[in-house]
């Protein structure tokens, strides 16, 4: 299960927070971005939530043919795209040891900072942009670095992903990724933009979690209904698969 959200609060700078919760290789990811003007009350939260559940592979060769029973209400293919990820750490593995994964995705700097949990149920804070990543790296390794020299880090993983995508039943996004080293993994995603306000009994974070659970349940029902389309199995993340081929003794 993956959750991405864009949260709006006053005039504060960009903030990305990630929550990973992955029973049966499900991941929850929440991205928060602040952009409302000063006049907006701080109690208002607008979140773009995306819930994603992984699967091992597609069970049919041509998903768009919609040949299973019951058939999708409708399905359309999206343009294929390529994602290039380069992951970094220092020679001592300080970032990974601290639960931080720094990468360039299609040339843009990102960092995932682990905030708790374990391999199957983890929480991460997601940072995006050169300056937030630079500060994150500096806080761990204790010295200044510049983007030109990759903040003093070396490459630990370099991989490309070809992503095929479809939209089914007008709202569920199905993606299937093929990495350049042969590993494959799929995801079903559901995205909604939701406005949250705190209530007497529930905080905004509690309301988000309740919404995430509801969205995840809808994905479970979707995948159960169209089980002919998916080989569920036990999905393996792309970095876990990559490091099996190029061991550094770590998993995402």
PLM segments and residue spans:
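Phosphate-end processing signature that detects enzymes handling 5′-triphosphorylated RNA
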Residues: 36-252
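Intrinsically disordered, glycine-rich low-complexity segments
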Residues: 2-8
């Amino acid at each position: 299960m993956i959750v991405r959200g864009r949260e709006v609060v006053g005039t504060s700078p960009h903030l990305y927070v990630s929550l990973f919760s992955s029973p049966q290789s499900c991941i929850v990811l929440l991205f928060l971005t602040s952009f409302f003007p000063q006049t907006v009350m701080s109690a208002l939260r607008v979140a773009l939530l995306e819930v994603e559940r992984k699967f091992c592979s597609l069970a049919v060769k041509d998903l768009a043919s919609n040949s299973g029973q019951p058939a999708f209400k409708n399905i359309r293919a999206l343009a294929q795209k390529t994602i290039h990820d380069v992951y970094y750490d220092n020679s001592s593995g300080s970032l990974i040891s601290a639960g931080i994964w720094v990468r360039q995705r299609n040339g843009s700097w990102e960092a995932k900072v682990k905030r708790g949990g374990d391999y199957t149920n983890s929480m991460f804070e997601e940072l995006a942009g050169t300056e937030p990543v630079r500060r994150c790296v500096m806080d761990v390794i204790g010295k200044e670095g510049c983007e030109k020299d990759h903040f003093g880090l070396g490459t630990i993983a370099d991989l490309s992903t070809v992503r095929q995508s479809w939209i089914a039943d007008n709202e569920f996004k199905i993606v299937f990724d093929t990495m350049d080293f042969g590993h494959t993994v799929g995801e079903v995603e559901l995205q909604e933009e939701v406005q949250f306000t705190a209530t007497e009994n529930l905080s905004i974070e509690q309301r988000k979690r309740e919404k995430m659970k509801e969205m995840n349940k809808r994905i479970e029902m979707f995948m159960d209904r169209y089980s002919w389309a998916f080989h569920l199995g036990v999905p393996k993340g792309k970095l876990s698969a990559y490091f099996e081929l190029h061991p550094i003794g770590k998993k995402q």
